[in-house]
Amino acid sequence: MEYVCVLNKIKIKMTTKILTLTFLLAITSIVAMSQVVPTTYRGAFAPAPTPMWTDNWTNWDPQNASYGTPTVTVSGVITSNTTWTKNNVYLLQGTVYVDSLVTLTIEPGTVIRGDANVVISSLVIQRGADIVANGTECNPIVFTSSKAPGSRLRGDWGGIIIEGRALNNLGTNIPIEGIGAAEPRARHGGVSPNDNSGSLTYVRIEFAGFAIAANNEMNSLTLGSVGSGTTIHHVQCSMGFDDAFEWFGGSVNCTHLVAYRTLDDDFDTDNGYSGTVQFALGVKDPAVSDDPAQSTSEGWESDNNGSSPFTLTPKTSAKFYNVTQIGAFRCSSNAGGITQPTAIGFRRGARLRRNTELEIHNSILMNNWRGLVMDADVVANAALGGAAFQNNVIAMDYTFSSTITNATGLALAAENVNGTPAYLTNPANGNNVISTPCDVLVNAWSFTNPDYRPNSAGSGAALSGGDLTPGIQIQTALFAANQTAELLVDIFEIGVGNSNGTVTVTIPVPSGFTLAVPSIATLTSTPTSGTNGTSAFFATPYNNGDWNFSLSGGFVIATSKAGVSIPQFGLSTLGFTIKRNLATPAGTNANLVITVSGGSDSTPANNSANNSLSTY
C-alpha cells in the first residue's frame, strides 16, 4: 500500500509575543514569556477538530519501519561544505565530526543510519559549524539504527550532538558529555547567546544514545551551549538509550518536540540553559527505565549545576509551555484499568533540583509515581519568582493517591518534604490535580495509533478555561490619622484563554476606612463608569475606564463593561484610594479582601487576595 501524506488543513499561525505578568501579594513574582504562542488549552495539543501537530512526520512504531540499504558510508571529519541527498542512504561509522566553518546540508526525506557494529557511531556538529537539516511534514529526515526491522535496540548508535558558543555556567571550553574529555572537537561554550548552529526541523532520531559511564552519556539529541540563532522544531526522539533531549547551557528556543519511549529523562536541562520550549510531548514505556542504582527516569530533570553549592551563573532558567508528559502507569482504556510499570526506575513527572529556576506552565503531567518534586532551594527560588510551576494539571499523582499495589518493592519515600505540596496546591499558582487520569486525553493508551488531544467528554474538560487571580498593590498598610494611600487591584488572567463575559470584583470596605474611586465623587448603588488614569505612587496606569463602580451594603463592586475581556497572560488594573477615617483610633486592625468572579473562570479556588491594615 502506498503511503500518502495528507497535510493538515488547519494551520496555526505562529507569532511572537512578549508578555509580562507581575503578581504583588505577600511576595512579588514576575513571569516573563518570550517566543510563546498564547493558547486556550493546557498540554501539547489543541482539542479536536484541530489535528495533532505530530501528524504525518512522526513514527510511533520505528521498530518495524523499513529503511533503505546504505549506499554511502561516512566516517571521520567533514572538512568542506557537504550535502546529503535523499536519493542516498547514509551510514555513519564511528563518530563523524562536522568541522568548524563547515555546513552540512541534508535534503528532506534523507535517511541516515548509525552503524550499530561500530562503537559510538554519531554525528557531532562542532562550534562554528552548521547543520541545515530541514525536512518537511511529508518528507522528514530520519536518523536511525543500521539494524533490520524487529532487531533494533536502544543505544544502537550514539545520536546527534550540537555544540555552540552560547553561555553556560561552567566555562567557555567545556567537554560535552558522551565523548571523551580529551577530544578537542567535543567542546562547547562561549559568550554569544545568539550563536547560530543551523537548523533541525522535521527530523526523527531513533534508537540512539550511549553511556560511557554514569553521568557521562550521549543522548538522542544533545545540545551544548547552543545559541538562540539556531532553529529547532518538529523533532522526535524515539526509543533512546539515555535522555531524549538534554540541554547543557545555551539559549536555543525549541518547539514541537517529541520524547517517545526513551530510557531515561524526556527533557533534561542543566548548566544555565535559558531557552523557551513550547509544544512538547513525552511518553514513557512502562517496560523500559533507567537503572535506579545509577539514575531514575523522569519527565523533566533540571539542575543548575552538578556539584554543591549549585550557585553557578547564569542559572538554569528555561521555560516550558504546553507540554503533555505521560508517565509509565498505563490505562487499559479511557474507562480505567491502571497497571503499574514493570521497570522499577520511574519516579517523577518533574524533578526540579539543585537550585534550578526552571519554569513549567500550561502543561499536563499524568500517570507518574510522583507528579512534582522540588528541592528546598527550588521552592525558595519559586517564592522569589525564580522558578515556577503554574497553571498545570497533575493527573493521578501516586505520592498522594497510591491505589496501586507496589509489587516491585519500590519505596514511596516521602520526598515532598521541601514544600512542594504547599506550592503545588497554592491557589495563586493555578494548578489542578485530577484523580481520574485515564480519560484526560482522547486515546493516550495506544502506542501505535495514539490521540493525545484533550478529551472534552472526560477529565480533559479541566484542561481549558480561564483563571482570574487578583493581586494587591498598596502604598502603605500602616496608616497615620486621616492618612490616604493609593491602592491598585490587579486582575490577572493566568488561565488557558481570555476572560469571557462579565468580571465582578467585590471589596468589603474595611472597618474604620473609606474606599474611593478616582474621578467618582461619591459611590452609590448605581453603577458609574470609571476613568483611566495613572497611580502617582506606583507610576502605573490603571484601567478604570473599562469598569463600572458601585457601593452596596458596605461592598465596593466593580463590574467589567460589555465587550471588555482580559487577555490570556494579561491583566486589568483597578485604581482606588483608601483612607483611615478621622475617628478611627490607633491600634485598629482591619483586613482588605479582594474577590473576583465571573469571566468564565474555571478555577474559582484562587479568586481572592487580602492584605492586613493597621493604624498608629
Describe the role of every protein-language-model region.
Residues 502-504, 508-556, 611-616:
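A surface/secretory-pathway sequence property marking extracellular, secreted
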Residues 489, 573, 577-602:
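Serine/threonine-enriched low-complexity regions used as flexible
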Residues 1-36:
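Bacterial Sec-dependent N-terminal signal peptides
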Residues 477-512:
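Short beta-strand elements of extracellular/lumenal beta-sandwich folds
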Residues 35-105, 115-128, 135, 140-242, ...:
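Extracellular beta-rich repeat passengers
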Residues 77, 478-484, 567-571:
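Solvent-exposed, conformationally flexible loop/turn segments
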Residues 38, 467-473, 480, 517, ...:
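Extracellular/luminal low-complexity Ser/Thr/Pro-rich, glycosylation-prone repeat/linker regions
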Residues 550-586:
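Low-complexity, intrinsically disordered segments enriched in Ser/Thr together with acidic residues
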